[in-house]
Structures are given as structure tokens and as C-alpha cells.
Amino acid sequence: MAGLAQHIQLKYIFGMNNEIRNSLQFHDEDRIIYPAGYNVVLHDLNDKSQHYYQGTNEYRGISCLALSPLKRYLALGVKGQRDPAIIIFDTFTQKRRKNLGLNLGNLDRYNIKQWVSIAFPSQNQETKYIFSLSGAGGDVVLCWWWHEKGKCLGSIDLGAQNDIYEISFNHSDANSICVTGNNFFGIYAKIEGTYVREDNQQKQKPSVQNGENSSAAQLPQPTLNIQVSAGNNNQNPQPEIKLENGNLISNLPADIVEKNFVAHLWMQCESYLVVFVESGEIILCDSRGNFLQIMEQSPRYFIVSRSGMIKIVAAVAYSKGFYVACSESIVLQYHYTQDNDKNPFTCVNQFKLKQFVELKEIEIKSICMNKAEDKLLIGLDNNQIYEIKIKPYHPETVNNDSSEDREVTLINHLNHTGPINSMDICKRKPIIATCSTDKTIKIWDYEKKQIKISWAFNEEAFCLSLHPQGFCVAVGFLDKLRLMNLCIHNSQNTTKNKAYKEISPFKGCKEIKFSNGGQYFAAVNSTSSNHVIQVFKFFTGENPSQLVFKGHTGRVKCIAWSSDDSFLLSCGLDGMILAWKLDQDFQHQQTIVPRIVDIHNKGVNFSGLTLTVDNKTIVAVGNDRHIHQAVINEQQPVDKTDKKLLDINLSCLAFPSSNKLLFAGIQDDARSSGAIRCFIYPLTHGKFTDYQAHDERGVEKMKITNDDRYIITAGKDGCIMVFEIKDKDARGMKLKDGYAKYSEEELITRSDLDDLKSTRDGLIVQINEFSNQNAMIGLNSRDDRIRQLETQIENNSQKRKQMFEQLLKSKTMEEQKLIQEINEIKEQFEQEIQVMDTKYQKEVMSLVEEYENQKRLHEIENNKNNKKKTKLLQEHSQKLQIIDDQYQKLLEEQITQKERVEKQINHLQKEQQEVLMQISEEKETEIKNLNQKNSKDEQAITDQGLKAKSDISITKKKIMQQQQEAQDLKEQKQEYERQKEKLKIQNQELRDKIDGQKKIILERDRTIGEKEKIIYNLKKKAQDLEKFKFVLDHKIKELKRDIVPREDEITKMKQETNNMDQYLKELNAYNNYLGTVVDELYTTQETMKEDIKQQRQQISVQQVKISRFKDDVYSLAQHILDYDKLVDETERLFMKHVNDKEVKRQSVEGDIMMEYRSQKKNLEKLVNMFKKSLQKDNQIHKDDKIRIMKDNVDLIREINTLRKSIKDITKGQQSNIPDQKGQTQHMPLQTPQLSRKSISQPVLPPISKSAMFEGVTQQNEIQKSHTQINPELVEEKQKVLNSLQTDILELQKVYEALNYEKHNLTQA
């Protein structure tokens, strides 16, 4: 029921939905669009503000979205309980424009479950038309809408059985449409014609043939002909949709046909269609869909993945190329080059998002680019959005946009990636606490709209509750409870976020709640059969026996405290609502706390419960579509509830302090799931309003802030939504009570406090030093600065005067020039006006003459038409006279015939009367004779009548039985006749079917004969191919003979690489030895640091003593004239500062100095040894590098000769193809032989990324240790290691090239 004023308004959303395809889009240069719940968020990148496009109450969630090319319209595909729809918004006004449902077109014959993709045509047609594509388990239907008038102009079933992903329009031709999906790729053409409307529709399902394609696949191309009738009086013509066969893609390889086509792009630079396959291939087609090539620089061919295969996830186009997002967060940039026809798009940039984001496992879900092409937005699977600033690519320069220069910024927050299990808010601070299935706990600030703390755990947190002061949070895990502090420096996963108290074992805690005062917290301990609510004392951690409440047999879904913490309420899936009174005096008297509410409702699964502000009424909801109300009576337990029927299921409830409104979250599979319903309380009014919030998965938790300003909801879609309450009375009550503002205190640990104090003291010292320095510098340079400024002012004034004079002169000159130009322009305009007047006058005269000529022609034609009319009228009158004469003759003939028939009738009547007279006379005589006979027979009959009466009664009974049997037989006969008629009809239908089957059999016999002929021809071709195969086998054997010695050479090379590996292992062992030495030095350094700290502390103490001693000496000097006082003061000073009577001098032990010198000598010897070993290693590596470079040159030469030989072999094979007569021409094969240099070349095996990473980390550790010893040694060692890395990489490239050539030879 609607008709109420708006009580809440959406203010902010934490979260997004990355399951929707192409969920990220630029609205303009500073605003982006992404879905969140059942809303589309318009996010400003500058001020972080949000605006929203909200769905309607008739539907439940968003399945797809699309922006028009001019960003004028936003189309949302929404899910419904039965049928989906498309909602179109005006982006200028942010209001809903149209709602396109299935009832607007003849779409009831399809099984449409939801819309998968929406596309707007080009800029000229976006205000009228829109195309939509359905899928997700139902029929795959392509629909054409006229959204300006809300009509469906046409639809067609594509017949695809797999998932369909995307639909789009060609930029240059708005009539061509491309559809891609899993094992589906089609191009459709929209043709508007002037044909007469027809009722029949032709359909054909385009399918990808699996087993019938050979090396070149040809698929059927569906062409969508939408023909609208023109010249008809009907204002709403219905379209006619047809499919025609054609070639979709020609020469497409067979292994690509059955792939998953993830995305496609219509390029702006040239008329290319780029199609992306999930397995990493990029297909290049022309604008008609004809296959051109598979790009050589596809990600599959040059990117090495950890999982073994790279996957393409998303793509976006720009003016001169496109970006491709792949798995493992890899982004590639392809640029268009005009001169290269073979490879028009080349990969010019490549980077990984993991280089800029400190996340372990991330995958890209969506990608988009702004119109200026300087910003790239990337959406990740963890619901985060990153903005990357991009520089334009210039082929003249090298390293245009290196990864180090990229600016990467996080746009949104660290959102949850799974459904939210629990949520709670704080009374004294504007914070929200949430836990999710992604094993994280997050603390949000809804006033500053930011995240404060994010923790990650190894196990899932099921529930949590915030302390009213905001310094602590209680979290329930699978087998324990944890109490954790919310500290300032506790936002990361460090050792500081450990719980300060842990309660275990505590099984399956799904609900936990702090009391309003914070002195208690209640938690549910769930075992296999019992569900016990335990109340703990927060400050002591005790759980008294009288605060253990039993009674639930199923899962407890909600716990609530009264406002004064005197009642504890609970409800669960067992259909029970229980309440206990917490009284301190009463608890000490008895060990068992009685229940004040004990309600049992079998078959009801309660999910939410709340109390009114006066603590008198309980309101609960469950899955029975009712609201249950119960009034608390402390004297007598309550066991019944008052029910109010609803049309949906509710999941959670919340009351503001005014008690005038009741907010409820909807979680219903039928309708309106995810919305917030606002009731007017009391519920007898029956008025409510629904507000859209989350998607169809429903609302999980709902809370109202302590000042009644906001209502906060959390859903299973992972989003947190903040709504502002518009009810002024609710906030007025809290303001009258004098409610304080939020507290500004923060919790901090002692170690953090010490660090802050030390940093503060250091900064104060630095400030004092800088202030003193600045004061001294200022006093010295102030006068000089004043003089310089005075001279600058004078010089500037003179320069400005000169500039002003020059500007005046230039101004006068420009004014004169402008006046002259204006006069010239006026003259030109006057001349042009005169010329135009003369032209228009001539044109008008010519038009007048034409008009008069047309008038004359019109009069002549009228005269001719009048003459024709008179002739036609005369001819018509003559024809009418002829027809009248003919019909008059026919009438006369019919009249004569009528007279003859009447005469015959009269004659027959007379004869009939005579016959009747004779019959009457004969009857009279017969009657007289019969009377006489009857009189005689009457007496005999009377005698027999008495006897016959008894017989008659018997016969009557028999007759009645026979009549009944006769009626039954008649009814049976009628039924048999009906069955006979049905059998006749069936017989005729069967005969017709037999005739049709005979015709089909004849047609199939014909086709079988034709196919047998085809098979015979194919067998002939197969025999020819076998002959050709025999020749190729012979050639392959010859090639294998040549390959064997090359394989031997490769084995020798592998042995050499193994030797190199052993040498590298020795180097690693030497590096490890150096690492141990560095660790020992590091430990000595730490001990030295500790000694330095102690010495500094002693120095500070001594300085304090010295300052105090100076003060005492100064006070003693005041009494230098008075000898007695001077003696007393000196004695006092002696007693104060001299504790020991004898002062001993400290002397350094000689053994310590000897050990120190010996250690110094040993370290110097080690340094000299390291220098010598490094010099030797440098010389060895230089020689190896020179030798390896020479071998690489030889290898490159050999590879070039092998490539030339492979090309000659392929040309020879093409020339050996059999001609029509079956003859072949053999070409001699020449295989190059490897040189002896290639045998001795060292080639390393491929090195894994993990080994490379471990080596780099070891090198970094060694470098850190060496910096403490000698910087010159570190630089030399680093140069050697860098040269080794480059050598290894070069050898790895050579090894990969050899494997590639070997693979080509084996294929040839």
C-alpha cells in the first residue's frame, strides 16, 4: 500500500556488485556508474559523492545495464518474479522514462527468464530504438524495441543452447548487430523496408556445427529482416522478422569454432571487428564478419601463466586500438599501425596490477576507459575499483608509459566480497562493524564515509557486537568467542589485532549482543541439540549460573535487550519467543530465572525481533507472512501473540525512538525481496511504503543510530546502505533529552603511546633547532632582503610603465585595424546581399512561370478527364439498357413456365378427389359388415376378457421389461455409431499421414541416392589422399633421419647446461656463506646499538646531575662573603652529591682491547679475501659472457638457415599436391646440417619464476648485509649478479627458440 510521504532517503552505499557484465562505465570525465544492490551508483571521482538510480517495486534485481553513446539514457535489465523488464532512465534528470515489459510485445510465446545484454544504436537512433538479448537458462531471444513509444517492434529466437554474453552495434553501420557467447557467434542485419505486413514468421536457429567442419568452417549467417509496412492506414504496423542463410565466417579454423567467445569490439580506427576467445586467442574480422586472421600477438602465444593457460576476461576499445584484461591481473595494450597489413594491431604495453596493489590473489572482472582516453578503470573480483592514469602512445618514442610512472589510485573502499553475516553499530561513535563470509571484519565510519579498520582471519566470523563506548568488539567464531580492542594503529593484519580475551570452547555462536549499558553481553552457545544463551559480565568476564538461559531447541536468530537492560529477549527457527527478567536482587535469591514470555508457534521460523521504546510490546516476524505482537506482563507469563497478515516475508525489524514508524527488511522468494518496508505504527492503520535497497537475496541486518538520524542495512549482496530518516519528530525527542555528540576519544596501546611520545619529543627538538637557525638567518638577511625587494619594486614599476605604454600603442593600432576590417566586412555583406536578392528574384520569377505552366497543364488535363467521363457515362448507360432487355426476356420465359405448372397442378387435384370418393364408399360398406361380425363376437370376447385380464397383467410386465431393454439397445446403438464415426475420422487422418510419410520416404530415397553419389566421389578423393599420404610419409621418414643427429646435439647442449647449473649452485652456496657472515655482523651491530642506548641514558642522567650541581654551586656562590654560611653550604653540597667516601678510577681491561683488535684484524682479512674472490669472479664472468654472445650469434645464423629450409619444404609439399589426373611432381629435399659451433654452445634449461624470485630475494638480503660492511664491495657484487641474470635470460630465450624450431620441424 502506497500513498505515504517519503520517510527515508538513501545517502551512501558501501559495496558494489561485480557479477554483472560490463558493470563499470564512465558517465562523464569525472563520474562513473556501477551497480550496488538494487541500485546503480553515480560516483563522483573528485568529491566522492554519490547519486542513485533506483529500481521499481515490481522487480527484484539488476541483470545488466547499458549507457547510450551520448550518455543521455541509462537502460537497466531487471529481474522479476515472473517476467523481466527493461527500465530506461534519463541521465539529465535522473528520472525513470520508460518501463519495457514483456506485455508490450508478443513475447508470451517465449520462455524469457532475464535480460543478459542491452545495446543502444548509433547517436542518431538512440532516442528511439534499443535492442535486448535474453538468456540465463531461458530462451535466447533478440528483441527490437521502440522505447520512445514503449513498443516491441520485433523478436526472434536465436536457438542457442549455451550462455550468451553480449550484443553490440557497429559504429559505422547501425544496422549490423553482433552477438557473442559460449560456442556462439553471429552477426545480424536490421533491414527496414516498405513491404506489406504479413502474419507468418520464418525462424531458423543458427547453430555451430561441431563435427562437420574441416580445416575451413562455414557457419550459417542469420540476417534479421525487419520489414515495416508503409502506405497503410494502420498507425501501429507490426514488423515481419525473417532469417536468411549466409556465410557467417569464412575460412575459420575448426579448433576455434567450438571456443568460448568472451567479448567483441567494433574498432573506430578501421572497419575491423575484433573477437576475443577465453583461451587467449584474438580473432580479427572485417565489418561483415568475414574471418581475416588470428593475431600473432594474442596473449596465448607470448604470455606465460602460472596456471598453464592465460584467459581473456574483458576488453575495451579506444580511438587507435584496444586494451585487453587477462587472468592474473595482466593488462595489454594493442595499437593500430596502418603500414602493417599482416599485423595491423601490435602489443605496445603490458603491466600487472599486482605491481601497484598489495594483494595476493586478484582477478580483473571489468574494464572501461573515459572519452579523453587518459583514465582506465579496472574492477576487481574483491569489489575494488582502481583508476590508472594513462599517457598517449607515440611510436617514435621508446617506453612511452612504463609501469614505474603509472599513477594508480583506489576509488572505492575495501568492500566485502561475500554475503554479510552480521552487523552492529555503536551508540557513542559513528562506526559500523560487519563480518562476512570472506573471513574479514571491517569497521566503517558512516559520517566520514570511509573504512577505519579491516582485519582478515583464517576462519569465518559468524557474528559480532560493538560495545556502546566503541572501544571493543565481541566476535563469535566456530568454536570460540573473542574480545578485541579497536585501536588507532590496529587497521592492518599485525600482531596487535589479537584478542585480549578469548572464551573457548564456545560452539557455533551465530548471535551475540552487548547490553545498552555495556556491562553485559549475551551469546548463543550451540551444541548438537541444545542452544543456550549465556550472559557474561563484560568487566570481569564471568558467566554466573543464574545467567545461563535454556529453552530453545533450534537455532537462535535474534537477541534483543530492553532499553534499561532489564529484559533479555530471543527468537529462533524453532518457533519460540522467550524473554527473561534480569534483576540483581532476584538473581541472588534463586538459581533459576523464570521466563516472563514463553511463546510457542509450531511451523514458524522466526528471524527478527524488537521491542518498543517503552519496553511493553514485543514485535517479531518469521516465514509465515505475519507480524506477531505480544504485550509483556511481569506478573503473568505471556504465551500468545496477536497476528497481522502480510503479503511478504520479513527478516529483521527496527524501531525509532518516536514509536510512530516500524522499519522492516524484506526477504521473500516471491516478490520485493531486498526492499525496506516502512509501517505506520500502530499497525491498525495498515499503511506502509516500500523503499528499494538490496537485490533479490534480501536484507540480513538492520540498525537505527542512537540519534535517529540514519537507518543502516546490510544484505547478502555484500553491500551496506545508509538511509537518512526524514521523520522530524523522531530526532526531536532525542534533541529534547539533550543527547550529547559523538565521543572523540580513541583507544591506543602503551607501545604506540611510547612511540608517539618519542617521535613528538624528537620533532619538538627539531622545531627548536630550526626556529633558532631561522631566527639567526632572518636577523642577518632581513636587511639584504628588504634592499633587494625595494630595487625589484622600482625595476618592476619602470617595466610596467613601459609595458603599459606599449600596450596603449598596440591597442590603438588594433582598434584601427578592426575598424577597417569591420568596414570591409560590411561592404562585402552588402554586396553579397545584393547578389542574393537578384538570385532570389530570378528564382521567384522562374517559379512563377513554372506555376503558370503547371496551371495550364492542369486545365488541359481536367478537360481531357471530363471528356473521358462523358464517354464512360454513355457507355455505361448503353450497357445498362442491354442488360435490362436480357432480364426482361428471362422474366417472360419464367412466367410462361409458371402458367404451365399451375395447369398441371389443377389437373392432378381433380384426379385425386375422384379417387377419394371411391375409397370412402368402399369403407362404409366394410364398416357395416364389420359391425355385424363384432356384435356376434362381443359375447365370446366378454367371456374371454375375464380370462385375458389375468394374462394381460402378466404380459404388461413383460412388455415394460422389453421396452427398457429396447431403450438400452438404442442407446448402445447410438454409442456404437458415434465410435464408428470417430474411427472413420481417425482412419482418414491415418491415411493422410500414410500418404505424407510415403512422400517423405520418396524424398529421402532421392536424398539417399544423392548422398551415395557424394560418398562415392569422396571415396575416390580419399584414395587419392592416401596416395598423397604415402608420399608424405616417405618424406617424413627422410626428415626424421635428419632430425636424429640434431637431437644428439641438443642432448649435448643439455649436458653443458647442467654443468652450468652446478656452477650456479656452487655460487649460491658461496652466497649462503656470505649470508651467515652478514648475520653474525648484524647480531654484533644490534648489541652495539643496545650499548649505545645505555650509554646515552647514562649521559642524559649525568647531564641532569651536572645541571643540578651547577645550580647548587651558583647558590653557594651567593654566600661567598659570609664564611660560616659558605662552609655550611659546601658541607651540604658534599653530602648531597658525594655518596661514596672513596672514588675509584675505572680502567679498561687489557683482554677486552686485545679481543677487539683481533676481531678487527680478522674482519679486515675477510674483506680482502672477498675483494680478491670478486675480482676473479668478475674476470671469469666476463670471459663466459663473451663466449656466450659468440655462440648466440652462431645460433641465430643456424635458426635463419633452418627457417629458410622449412619454407622450401612447405613450398615443395604444395607443389606435390595431386592434380585432377592423380599425377604428382616430386621436388628434391635439401636439409641443412648443423655446424660444429652449434654443438658446443651452452644453453640453459627454462628457469621457473619461483626459483628466479628466490634468487632475487637472496640477492636483496645479501645486498642489505653488504651495505653494512663496505659499499664498494656491494656495488661490484651487484654488477656481477646483474650480468649473471642477463646471461641467464639470454640463454633461456635461445633455448625457447631451439624448442620452437624443433617443434616446427616435427610438424613438417
Swiss-Prot record:
PROSITE patterns: WD_REPEATS_2, WD_REPEATS_REGION. WD repeats lie at residues 57-99, 110-154, 415-454, 504-546, 551-590, 645-689, 694-733. The lineage of its organism: Eukaryota, Sar, Alveolata, Ciliophora, Intramacronucleata. It comes from the Eukaryota. The keyword Transmembrane helix does not apply. Belongs to the CFAP57 family. Disulfide bonds: none annotated. This is Cilia- and flagella-associated protein 57 C. GO terms for cellular component: cilium. Pfam families: WD40. It is found in: Cell projection, Cilium. Associates with components of the nexin-dynein regulatory complex (N-DRC), a key regulator of ciliary/flagellar motility, and might act as an inner dynein arm (IDA) hub or linkage. The gene is CFAP57C. Residues 779-1000 form a coiled coil. It comes from Tetrahymena thermophila (strain SB210). InterPro entries: CFA-57 (IPR052993), WD40/YVTN_repeat-like_dom_sf (IPR015943), WD40_repeat_dom_sf (IPR036322), WD40_rpt (IPR001680). Keywords: Cell projection, Coiled coil, Repeat, WD repeat. The keyword Transcription does not apply. SUPFAM superfamilies: WD40 repeat-like (SSF50978). Forms a heterodimer with CFAP57A. Associates with components of the nexin-dynein regulatory complex (N-DRC) and the CFAP184:CFAP263 complex. PANTHER family: CILIA- AND FLAGELLA-ASSOCIATED PROTEIN 57.
